[in-house]
């Protein structure tokens, strides 16, 4: 990929919310150049700190639903179009974001977590398991038994959706009424 395409990719990733570590891994641009680009696009310095590193986050109820949606979109793009990994990733993330925004919801899966998810699949840390009830394919730990797997949509946890934010109130207990 030539330098112009590298810069365009970096700008696109920054606009979508990529962290500096993602940019460094996916482009060949120098760290200094990426920081300058980030400041130009976002108007501030890139955030510091470690990237998410736990695969367990992707297994919890709501993140699992969103991660599964995103990863299935990504796989579909890769398998049907044959476009390169990073382009498929950007297209899949845009489609995921578009799909979630149809319900006026905030995306649970940020771009950096989506990128980490793909890396976990590539490293054989995560896999897709088919739900025995609905037939959907959901993110699960690699090498976990898949026979009789039931997804979080078919069998949500008892407190699913009963958060302060979902209730629109300060007290969670009022959701139970």
Which residue ranges define each predicted feature?
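Long, charge-rich, low-complexity intrinsically disordered regions
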Residues: 1-12, 16, 21-177
């Amino acid at each position: 990929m030539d330098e112009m395409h590298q810069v365009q990719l970096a700008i696109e990733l920054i606009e979508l919310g990529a962290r500096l570590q993602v940019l460094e891994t996916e482009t060949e641009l120098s760290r200094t150049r990426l920081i300058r680009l980030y400041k130009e696009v976002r108007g501030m310095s890139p955030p510091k700190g470690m990237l998410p590193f736990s695969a367990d986050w992707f297994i919890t109820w709501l993140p699992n639903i969103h991660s599964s949606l995103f990863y299935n979109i990504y796989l579909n793009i890769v398998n049907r179009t044959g476009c390169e990994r990073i382009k498929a990733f950007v297209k899949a993330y845009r489609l995921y974001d578009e799909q979630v925004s149809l319900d006026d919801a905030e995306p649970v899966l940020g771009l950096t977590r989506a990128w980490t998810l793909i890396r976990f699949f590539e490293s054989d840390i995560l896999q897709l398991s088919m739900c025995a009830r609905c037939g959907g394919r959901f993110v699960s730990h690699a090498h976990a038994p898949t026979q009789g797997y039931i997804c979080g949509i078919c069998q949500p946890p008892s407190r699913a959706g009963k958060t302060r934010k979902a209730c629109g109130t300060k007290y969670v207990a009022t959701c139970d009424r």
